[in-house]
């Protein structure tokens, strides 16, 4: 009779496939929240005659409602194709490389719980490596998401994700695809460390509590916690990254940081915090839950008699 025997580990390619699939599924589910976050981050203070500010987008729910009203429901999924491009590459690499890099840091003979600082270092490295490769997809996603409702007769900059890649290269040069790479490396390395290392550590801690095991509940709790840490730590860098990618008037990362701080104050770096947390918390819960379940499929050995 045919049967299955559990495997101890899966290959890098299998991990890459699992990670890319889980990241794409989470992206598809949560990109409206990401679109709201980008719009809030790119929004600047608008002076009026009486000295007050009347922002177009107010809060996560208000932003979602405004986009849906002005641009239709499909407007909430702007940049989804580029987002899926990004997750296939970035999601697959950052998670797929995490375990091999951890093993490289501690040695293949290591037995026991890997120290937290080693997990953080591994996640920092894989996040940086992955986004260097995936930066063009991130740039295109932000450019597409940043376009709101345009006045009558004003054409859109890009017809879609593929057109955006070609248009950017044609008008701005190949190097433009890596615009904002500096803050993007910083942001994604830090957020990746906050997500992967915290998920790893929290899951490990939860499973030491009586009656808790490697279950759906454990994955959900650890995923939500990972999203919270990621937003708290990465939000300022995320704002700078979004502004540099969505607005070419900034000379560099420092210029963007100084101008934002000078004109809008420190709280500008936490614009879109609620939709960002709602999105990342949900994203991480969905992604890690999906990842754990898909990996279980690969962790079953090939059918044998």
Swiss-Prot record:
Report the InterPro entries cross-referenced here.
Mit_carrier (IPR002067), Mito_Metabolite_Transporter (IPR050391), Mitochondrial_sb/sol_carrier (IPR018108), Mt_carrier_dom_sf (IPR023395)
> Where do the Solcar repeats lie?
10-104, 114-205, 214-297
Q: Which PROSITE patterns match?
A: SOLCAR (PS50920)
One GO biological-process annotation of the entry reads: amino acid transmembrane transport
Q: Which GO terms describe its molecular function?
A: amino acid transmembrane transporter activity
Q: Which UniProt keywords apply?
A: Membrane, Mitochondrion, Mitochondrion inner membrane, Repeat, Stress response, Transmembrane, Transmembrane helix, Transport
- From the Swiss-Prot or TrEMBL record, state where the protein is found: Mitochondrion inner membrane
Is Secreted given among the entry's keywords?
no
Q: Which GO terms describe its cellular component?
A: Golgi apparatus; mitochondrial inner membrane; plasma membrane
Q: How does it sit in the membrane?
A: Multi-pass membrane protein
Checking Pfam families in the record gives: Mito_carr (PF00153)
Q: Where is it mainly found?
A: mitochondrion
Which ranges of the sequence are coiled-coil?
Answer: none
Q: What induces it?
A: By chloramphenicol.
Q: Which residues cross the membrane?
A: 16-36, 73-93, 120-140, 179-199, 220-240, 270-290
- Disulphides: none
**Protein family according to the UniProt entry:** Belongs to the mitochondrial carrier (TC 2.A.29) family.
Q: What does this protein do?
A: PUMPS are mitochondrial transporter proteins that create proton leaks across the inner mitochondrial membrane, thus uncoupling oxidative phosphorylation. This leads to a decrease in the efficiency of oxidative phosphorylation and an increase in heat production. May be involved in protecting plant cells against oxidative stress damage.
This chain belongs to the protein called: Mitochondrial uncoupling protein 2
- The species this protein was found in: Arabidopsis thaliana (Mouse-ear cress)
The organism that produces this protein has a lineage beginning with:
Eukaryota, Viridiplantae, Streptophyta, Embryophyta, Tracheophyta
